[in-house]
Amino acid sequence: MKVGQLVVLVDEVDGLEAGREGCIMGVRDDMLTVGCQTSERLHLVLAHTWQVLPRELFRRLSAREGREL
């Protein structure tokens, strides 16, 4: 994963629900700083690498399971 990559949270992280899209703002070891926009403001959350998926992979997996995004 790299800075600027679009990702989707697959777990609830710091009060933001799973399925929320964000952009990687920073990477350090197995931790990511992810910026997620809500209607009120930009939330920066600290997530483990296993708590997010690249957006395109998430969409492909969701389509395979028959879910609409």
List the predicted regions and their residue ranges.
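Basic/aromatic-rich interaction segments and small domains that mediate binding to polyanionic partners
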Residues: V3-R59, A63-G66
